[in-house]
From Swiss-Prot:
ATP binds at G222, D223, S224, R225, T226, G227, K228, T229. Its EC number is 2.7.7.-, 3.1.21.-. A motif (RCR-3) lies at residues 103-106. Homooligomer. Interacts with the replication enhancer protein (REn). Interacts with host retinoblastoma-related protein 1 (RBR1), and may thereby induce the transcription of host replicative enzymes even if the cell is not dividing anymore. Interacts with host PCNA. Interacts with host SCE1 protein. Binds to host RAD54 protein to ensure geminiviral replication. This is Replication-associated protein. GO terms for biological process: DNA replication. It comes from Bean golden yellow mosaic virus (isolate Puerto Rico-Japan) (BGYMV). The active site is at Y103 (for dna cleavage activity). Residues 143-153 are annotated as: Binding to RBR1. Transmembrane segments: none annotated. It is found in: Host nucleus. Residues 8-116 form the CRESS-DNA virus Rep endonuclease domain. Essential for the replication of viral ssDNA. The closed circular ssDNA genome is first converted to a superhelical dsDNA. Rep binds a specific region at the genome origin of replication. It introduces an endonucleolytic nick within the conserved sequence 5'-TAATATTAC-3' in the intergenic region of the genome present in all geminiviruses, thereby initiating the rolling circle replication (RCR). Following cleavage, binds covalently to the 5'-phosphate of DNA as a tyrosyl ester. The cleavage gives rise to a free 3'-OH that serves as a primer for the cellular DNA polymerase. It comes from the Viruses.
Amino acid sequence: MPPPQRFRVQSKNYFLTYPRCTIPKEEALSQLQKIHTTTNKKFIKVCEERHDNGEPHLHALIQFEGKFICTNKRLFDLVSTTRSAHFHPNIQGAKSSSDVKEYIDKDGVTIEWGQFQVDGRSARGGQQSANDSYAKALNADSIESALTILKEEQPKDYVLQNHNIRSNLERIFFKVPEPWVPPFPLSSFVNIPVVMQDWVDDYFGRGSAARPERPISIIVEGDSRTGKTMWARALGPHNYLSGHLDFNSRVYSNSVEYNVIDDISPNYLKLKHWKELIGAQKDWQSNCKYGKPVQIKGGIPSIVLCNPGEGSSYKDFLNKEENRALHNWTIHNAIFVTLTAPLYQSTAQDCQT
C-alpha cells in the first residue's frame, strides 16, 4: 500500500472554513493573530455567518507576506473560551484573495486586521471583467468604496488611471452640499449700522426679477469677534470663500444669492477675480491654479469681510498710490463700512467672528 499522503498547503493566501463554530469573530481573529507562523501575516479577515437552519460557522482569509507552507493540519484550530471544545477548519490555498474576500463579504458580519493585499488573479480563470468591476463601483455607496473595488479588481487601471478615475468618481458621486444653517438668527444682530441695513434692504428686499443687473457689493471692515461673519452668513443662501478662492462645484454654487469673501487678502483677490466678484459680473471663467477652468454664472453681489491692518484692510490697500485705478473702480461697485462695535449684544456669540 502507498503511504498516506502527508498534509501540505503552500500559498500566500489561506481560506479557512470552520463549520458549526460558535466562537465569536473577535475571539477568532485574536487567536489567528497569535498563531506562530514562519512567514509574517499581512491581513486577516473573519466572517461570522449562520446557515438557514441557524447553525453558525466562520470563514477566514489569511494573507501572508510570502508563500507559507503549512504541514500541520491542526495549526489553525480555534479553542472555545467558554467550554472544552476545539474547532478544526477546512484549509485551502486560495489562488485569488480578491475572490475569497468578495465571497466572505457577501453575507454575515466581518472583522479584519491589517492591510488587504491586492492580487491580479481571479478564480474564474482570467482577469475580472472590467465591466463587472466598474458596474460594482458605480453601485458602491461612496467614493472610497468604489475606489477600493477598483483597487482590488482592476489594479492596473487603479495605478495607471488613478487621477482620472478619482476625478470621474467625484463627479459621479457628487452630492449637493447641505445648506449652511446659521447658529444665530438674523434677529440677534441688533447693532447693524444704518448703511449696512440699507444695503440689505435694497438687495434682499426685492424679488430676483427686480434686482439690478449688477448689484452693488459691500466691504465690511472690523475687528475679530464683532459678529460680521455670522451676520453675513445668516442673510440667505450663499457661497462662503475663506482664505482662498475655490470654485470647485463641491463648495461653490451658481444658484445662491450672494458670495461671502472672508479673510481673503486684498492683494490675493486683486491677482485673481476682484472685478468679477466685487463687480457682480456675469458669465465669467475662473482659471485658478490647480483646477480646470470653471464657468461662473455670476451676477450676484459679494460681502467682503476683513480685519483692519496692513495686508488685511481693503481700505488701506486701495489707498495706496499703485492701486489708484482699482480704488476708483471699486468705489463705483461697492460700499464701505467700518465697524466700531459688535453687531450683537448676546455674550453667546462672543466666540464667533
